[in-house]
Amino acid sequence: MNFWEYLHSRHQQLLSDAYQHASAVFQCMVVATLIGVLIGVVTYRSEWAGNLATTATSTILTIPSLAMIGLLIPIVGLGVPPTVIALTLYGLLPIVRNAIVGLRGVDPSLVDAATGIGMSRPMRLVRVELPLAWPPILTGIRVSTQMLMGIAAIAAYASGPGLGNEIFRGIASLGSKNALNQVLAGTLGIIVLALLFDAAYVLIGRLTIPRGIRV
């Protein structure tokens, strides 16, 4: 059968895999964003702490995704847990780096003005610094999401959810009549999801970033 016939015959399974793939990436991005922004908030005032945070999260990205998942399997088993841990760790670097850069880039005069009207440090952070640092943080989230879309496909190695299962099934059956269709379906599905997520981030940016500070 040709590719379109294959999509029609497998559309329910493909939609299920696509939903699981998108859900895994979304949930891991939420966790990575919370952790990454927290690390940025804790470390941005100190040069050495910021460098340490960036270096540590950069080091994680040097570990091949298959190796990372392989190391996690004996600890947390197969399925969702190694997928969630690996994706969350891989998603940290762009968020941590951009959170630090964004917070350090806030105009000190604005912080001084907030202090002058009686704002406490936590209030300054929440009401002045984080909103002004939001554009680079959102950019970091977008970059992380695009990275995780591809890395999530490797989760099929650990029986994880997502479109990677379709790709791995095709690779395992190379030479069969549907092998290429399986690989193409999984790959194109991931590309479509990545584009949809990026479009959503553009919309979020339009809605949450004041026009005066848009980059």
What are these regions (language model features)?
Residues 1-29, 169-180:
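Periplasmic/extracellular loop-to-transmembrane helix junction in inner-membrane transport proteins
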Residues 16-24, 73-94, 182-186:
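Loop-to-helix entry region at the N-terminal start of transmembrane alpha-helices
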Residues 22, 26, 30-38, 42, ...:
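Generic alpha-helical transmembrane segments of integral inner-membrane proteins
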Residues 26, 89, 121-154, 201:
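Transmembrane alpha-helices
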Residues 39-72, 87, 97-105:
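Cytoplasmic-entry segments and transmembrane alpha-helices of multi-pass inner-membrane transporters
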Residues 87, 140-195, 199:
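Non-cytoplasmic
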Residues 98, 102-137:
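Short cytoplasmic-facing helical segments at TM-TM junctions of multi-pass membrane proteins
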Residues 101-104, 108, 184-215:
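C-terminal transmembrane helix and the adjacent membrane-cytosol boundary/short C-terminal tail
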